[in-house]
Amino acid sequence: MRKIVNEMKLRLPARSVNEAVARSCISAFVAEFDPTLEELCDIRCALSEAVTNCIVHAYKGYREDEPHYIYISVRLYDSREITMEISDNGCGIEDIETAMRPMFTTGEPSERCGMGFLVMDNFTDSLTVKSKVGRGTTVLMRKILTPEPSEGNE
């Protein structure tokens, strides 16, 4: 049975500047596992895409003067597994299967390419999306890091 060795929770306003904040926080947090550069880039890219999707899509049409947040929970397990849960209380996704198709976008095609979920899926080992219209969306990603080199084999 895997055991949680560390956990981080963030609540950030849904503002584009906070996408970089989330990336920086997760980079520092997962450093304790000493991921490879490729693994770190994968984690940062997947998280960045999930946060950006929340910022761009979750609160579209909502009042600007009301606070809107993105919730991020990251767990590190003794098995060198990392889980990242990104959620919002926004509009939700009506049809997850359709939304996950490459090139699908609810925005203007000239502004959005509809590759967000594909990017998240390709940079992680698993991707799960749950959503309720009018209640929000949760994206759960899992990344398994390469084993630590054993003593003497470095």
Question: PLM features: what roles do these ranges have?
Answer:
Residues M1-K9, C54-E154:
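Conserved beta-strand-loop-beta-strand hairpin that lines the nucleotide-binding pocket
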Residues K9-V21:
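STAS-typified acidic loop motif
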Residues P13-A14, P35, C91:
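Structured loop/turn residues at secondary-structure junctions
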Residues V21-S24, T98:
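Generic recognition of short, well-ordered alpha-helical segments
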Residues R23-S48:
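Conserved short strand/loop->alpha-helix "switch" segment adjacent to the catalytic nucleotide/phosphoryl-transfer site
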Residues E49, N53:
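Conserved polar catalytic motif of the HATPase_c/GHKL fold
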